[in-house]
Amino acid sequence: MLDLFKAIGLGLVVLLPLANPLTTVALFLGLAGNMSSAERNRQSLMASVYVFAIMMVAYYAGQLVMDTFGISIPGLRIAGGLIVAFIGFRMLFPQQKAIDSPEAKSKSEELEDEPSANIAFVPLAMPSTAGPGTIAMIISSASTVRQSSTFADWVLMVAPPLIFFLVAVILWGSLRSSGAIMRLVGKGGIEAISRLMGFLLVCMGVQFIINGILEIIKTYH
């Protein structure tokens, strides 16, 4: 049992800095400013479920999926970087509000009646939390621990789902507490956070792409 706790602790130490729930909370604050409390709670729960599912698939079938489709880790990083940068541009340069006219008001009311956009999978779960770095770490760790004799076989079977579940729970708790932050900073603060996070996401996306290109150069050099 002690080995199980050691494995879980080691997994959390490795994954939490990569998953970085606080970054996801800041992104959530920028994207969910106009959502109702119930919708924010629903998106928080869905994002946590998606993160758990992505990590489980990455651990048990990640390498198989990547080999089947011929996807490399550098390719995963570059693709994730493009997604992150695109999301960042949209946050940094949001669409301008329509001119105040009867037609614009009518259209605005129609849009308000429509369901809010689903942000749980993209970008909250992927690539913000379970991004290229997290997935790459899980896939590489999966192949490493299966060849290792540090832990018993039953620990290697039980620990990964528990680690991923705890990461998802930590993310869910962090996102649920974002409501208090929203009330504290107000709408203007949310817009400022959104622009700032947009800029940071563009930087992160570009860095993902650079890292992927550098890995390609090292591989084929």
UniProtKB/Swiss-Prot annotation:
It comes from the Bacteria. GO terms for cellular component: plasma membrane. InterPro entries: Multi_antbiot-R_MarC. It is a multi-pass membrane protein. PANTHER family: UPF0056 INNER MEMBRANE PROTEIN MARC, UPF0056 MEMBRANE PROTEIN YHCE. Keywords: Cell inner membrane, Cell membrane, Membrane, Transmembrane, Transmembrane helix. It is found in: Cell inner membrane. Belongs to the UPF0056 (MarC) family. Residues 29-44, 90-118, 176-196 are cytoplasmic. The keyword rRNA-binding does not apply. Pfam families: MarC (PF01914). Coiled coil: none annotated. The chain crosses the membrane at residues 8-28, 45-65, 69-89, 119-139, 155-175, 197-217. Its main location: membrane. This is UPF0056 inner membrane protein MarC. Residues 1-7, 66-68, 140-154, 218-221 are periplasmic.
